[in-house]
């Protein structure tokens, strides 16, 4: 179900690579809107634009704006001829052809087909940090950089939340700050520096084609949930962890934790992490948590121990000292916010993410 509106662009707001914020007059009222120029071009003041306002009407948190679907005044010119025949956002009105790392027209096709480690599906022990929430990304990088500032890091964005890479202010800020050496959008996600058809290919390309020392895998902004055991988008982190295991990488889990979430199921260790570890994970993974004696960490470690005991895989709890984590987090070039709470309001999710980054650095030769 889509709620359609048309309006007139009144103001061009903040712009960055891949996204432009607008103020659009709809039915006489100012409406915040977002245009992704690679999809719909760059609107100008006075243009009539067609908007999808469904998420805005429902008050869904991550978006907070209408989405420009088309510019009725000046449709963008045809793009220049370019290689690539893999379609993403398939069979939607905004489907597009991209050049993926794997396909025949790619300069990396031969490596993706002939490289012995790629063909064998062998990450050769590359650390892969896996997080449920997109907001964990800067904290992971902060911890990693504090321990190994010269490590080459790639971010793989999966397709279980936002599909356009350009939707993320956070990722754009990390790229601009030089904190990410490369980005790959996998599956139906699109718009990263590189495109991949599968997470498996993305991981192998990060290691053997793009020269990454560490990969961080997380969905984009817009985590979906339903207050049920199996109906939430972050469940796919279990599939990613299993992929890392199959490909002989070293999986490092960022457990989802909170000391202040008003929902009991997410207080302490989230039931999301418990479900992934106890019901989905089939291989090995290191689950990093502070060794602090202060709340909520003893409770979180007890919850993790229970999940590990019930697991069909072989997860391992790694308890690390958290001294200096605050200093690591203070270096972030982008604001730290998770589920509407800053690091000042609740540092726990960022502490676990930073320690996961430190642990990944410790796994490097």
What are these regions (language model features)?
Residues 39-47, 63, 69-83, 127-131, ...:
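Accessory terminal and edge-of-domain segments that mediate assembly/interaction
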Residues 58, 162, 260:
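Flexible, glycine-rich phosphate/dinucleotide-binding loops
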Residues 2-26, 145-150, 165, 169-218, ...:
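Non-transmembrane, aqueous-exposed alpha-helical and coiled segments at domain scale
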Residues 43-51, 55-56, 60, 89-92, ...:
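Long, contiguous hydrophobic alpha-helical segments, chiefly transmembrane helices and signal peptides
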Residues 1-125, 148-152:
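Extended, charged alpha/beta regions that create polyanion-binding interfaces
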Residues 99-196:
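Phosphate-binding glycine-rich loops and their immediate beta-loop-alpha structural context
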